[in-house]
Each structure stands twice: as structure tokens, then as C-alpha cells.
Amino acid sequence: QKKRKHIKERDNYLCQICIRELYGTKRKYNSEGLQVHHALPINLSEDLKLDESNLITLCSMHHSMCDKGQIPYKEVKNIIIEQNQK
């Protein structure tokens, strides 16, 4: 719960795909229906479950696209790295 809040704060309570206007973004400053996504799924990386380098704030649409593999892992990972450097 605390980690989820921290990641949303790090990401300014905005979907990190929408803010970059990628993958069918409908609204750049999207703060609705935000979820914290594990870039590498928990079943593949239990040890990264709470690691900031594996977590990103996404809207429900982009979260679903990531889960379906429609947004490449490497691209999501690069956004996370960028966010952690701020």
C-alpha cells in the first residue's frame, strides 16, 4: 500500500504512457483509474515485487496493454529508469 502510493507520487499521479503520448493515448494528463504495474510480472520476479525499478504508474488501458504484451517490456523499463533518475 505504501509502495503503491510512493510510486504514484514519483510518477506525479499520471499514467507514464499517456504523459508521453504513446500507444493510443486519449488524454496526455491522465490521472484517472491509475494502477501500479509490475514491468516484469511477479510470477517471473518475486524478488522485484516491491522494487521501484520494476514499478510504474499506468492507466487501466495501458496497464491492460502491457499485460497483453502490446507495449514492449524494454520500453516500459526505460520509462521507469527515466522516472527513477528525476
Could you describe each region identified by the protein language model?
Residues 20-25, 55-77:
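Short Cys/His-centered divalent metal-binding micro-motifs
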Residues 76-86:
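Charge-dense (acidic/basic), low-complexity helical/coil segments
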Residues 40-55:
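Short linker/helix segments within small regulatory modules
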Residues 2-5, 53, 74:
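Generic alpha-helical secondary structure signal
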Residues 40, 64-65, 85:
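Compositionally biased, intrinsically disordered low-complexity segments enriched
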Residues 1-35, 59-61:
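Short cysteine-rich loop/turn motifs with clustered Cys
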Residues 26-41, 70-76:
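Short cysteine/histidine-rich zinc-coordinating motifs and their immediately flanking basic loops
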